[in-house]
């Protein structure tokens, strides 16, 4: 974990219990110390709480591998020896470590009773720089590990490989490229304006639906994890409304 992280008093005890149950790699519940500061910190904090509660917890229930985050995880000496230390140096080395472990057949566990408190960015500029690194890191990991994951998914019928191939795939970039190509096809006379306007109208509806879904997801996260979130109901209502802005800002970030 990072030097500025705070740990629940039972963190090490709970992680050790999970480790003793047989997992060689474990991640924990990633909470935040400053969720209530503003809409930027709340967006990041809710994202990580959602990942812990609904993604990693669900993967554990399904018997699939979980995703190691940038802090709050552990691995055995055996894994360290196999990797000859820490050999991961892409921009998102936590994600690289996750993909490498899956390709080695490891199942990464999640310990929801071990809670870590991380500090989130409080200005949009800080958040932009952080997520720009993440976006570029995802593309790096997809470049180096994407085909290997696809091959493992097909040959081994490994659900974790399918899961994380979809996680790495840059769908936002592909979606915007599709719109640009549509406009170019119209300009060169390959397709009609009417067909593209119809498609754009469909995309506009999808964006509205996505915004509503994002707010619902933020609200669901807050309701499910209310006991672990230190903010007033008034603040949380505002952060539900601002959550889609935080998420949609990934679109321009992805193209830098």
What are these regions, as identified by a protein language model?
Residues 1-6, 86-89, 101:
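The conserved acidic donor/metal-binding loop of glycosyltransferases
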Residues 5-7, 31-34, 96, 115:
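A short, conserved beta-strand element in the Rossmann-like catalytic core
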Residues 9-91, 132, 139, 143:
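Long helical/loop segments within the catalytic core of UDP-sugar-dependent glycosyltransferases
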Residues 46-53, 129-149, 214-220, 256:
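Catalytic core of nucleotide-sugar-dependent glycosyltransferases
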Residues 63, 98-117:
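Catalytic donor-sugar/metal-binding loop of nucleotide-sugar-dependent glycosyltransferases
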Residues 70, 110-111, 117-129, 143:
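Catalytic cores of eukaryotic secretory-pathway lumenal/extracellular enzymes that build
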Residues 91-97:
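Acidic donor-binding loop at a coil-to-helix junction in glycosyltransferase catalytic cores
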Residues 167-256:
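Membrane-embedded multi-pass helical conduit in multi-pass membrane proteins
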